[in-house]
Design a protein with these regions (language model features):
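Short, acidic/small-residue loops that bind anionic groups at enzyme active sites
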Residues: 139-152, 187, 201-224, 239-240
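Residue-level recognition of the N-termini of beta-strands and the immediately preceding loop/turn
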Residues: 115-118, 211-213, 242-245
Length: 274
């Protein structure tokens, strides 16, 4: 009966040792140049290659896979995504509302077993920090999807360390914001907040993603920031598109709106009632 091959070979294969300088005095210097050359690095270890224009598609794929792998490892199936200005300080009333909202969501998901509903933010300061901080206050997991910027944006200290991710591409970051979102809560903010809000509104409008409750916190701000009724009057949107979002003022009203939205559709969020 033939014995299976051993894990280790008994004899070396050709090339397992470099050419001896006894055979060629110049071999050692030539070998050192080859081993130090970027071209000889394996592709996965060649940072220069991985950052070339031609490998952009690979980088996008890696950003998708890294975040997806980590979220699956932690069994994150549902998120409540919070957007808002990075510029708002702790003294802002909106900061306190966002913190309280994060606490409510965090409390509702505690000790619920698999697939609990978690806060997800952009991982930065301001409103993002407040929502992560509220979840942290409640002892709950929360997620931060930070972004590499020309000037470093550090993550806020309240994101769960194992769920703090950093992205190179806004596009892939926004993809992960949308992928598990069961609700979107948007506080006052600037261009970045508007971009994130309108991305979700467009995806819901076109049914590229299932509609989710979108709550704009601070009606007075939002009435001035954009005018959907004007868009309707100009024929740019349909009447039903006005129903893609609602307004709220408090953390409790925001959370209750989200819970009621899902309950009316017969698919309540997997969390305990507040």
């Amino acid at each position: 009966m033939t014995e299976p091959p051993a894990d280790e070979r008994q004899r070396s294969l050709p090339g397992e040792h470099p050419k001896s300088p006894h055979d060629d005095p110049d071999a050692a210097e030539a070998m050192a140049r080859i081993m130090a050359s970027d071209s000889y690095r394996e592709a996965a270890e060649d940072l220069g290659f991985l950052n070339e224009e031609l490998t952009r598609g690979l980088r996008l794929q890696l950003e998708y896979l890294k975040a997806e792998t980590l979220l699956r490892q932690h069994d994150i199936r549902h998120t409540v995504v919070v957007f808002g200005s990075a510029r708002l300080a702790e003294t802002s009333p909106w900061y306190e509302v966002a913190r309280e909202f994060g606490r409510l969501v965090g409390q509702s998901g505690l000790n619920r077993g698999e697939g609990c509903t978690c806060i997800m933010t952009g991982g930065g300061p301001g409103i993002m920090e407040a929502a992560n901080r509220g979840a942290h206050d409640a002892g709950a997991l929360s997620i931060g999807l930070n972004i590499t910027l020309p000037r470093e944006q550090f993550p806020n200290p309240y994101v769960t360390p194992e769920l703090a991710l950093r992205f190179r591409y806004f596009a892939m970051r926004k993809f992960h914001f949308a992928l598990r979102a069961r609700a979107l809560v948007v506080f006052p903010g600037g261009y970045g907040t508007m971009d994130e809000l309108f991305e979700i509104l467009e995806l819901s409008q076109t049914r590229k993603m299932p509609p989710v409750p979108v709550v704009l916190v601070g009606e007075r701000f939002w009435r001035r920031a954009f005018d959907p009724k004007f868009l309707l009057e100009q024929g740019m949107i349909d009447p039903e598109d006005l129903g893609l979002f609602v307004f709220a003022e408090s953390a409790d009203a925001t959370w209750r709106t989200i819970l009621d939205w899902h309950a009316r559709r017969g698919a309540p969020l997997p969390c305990a009632p507040v």
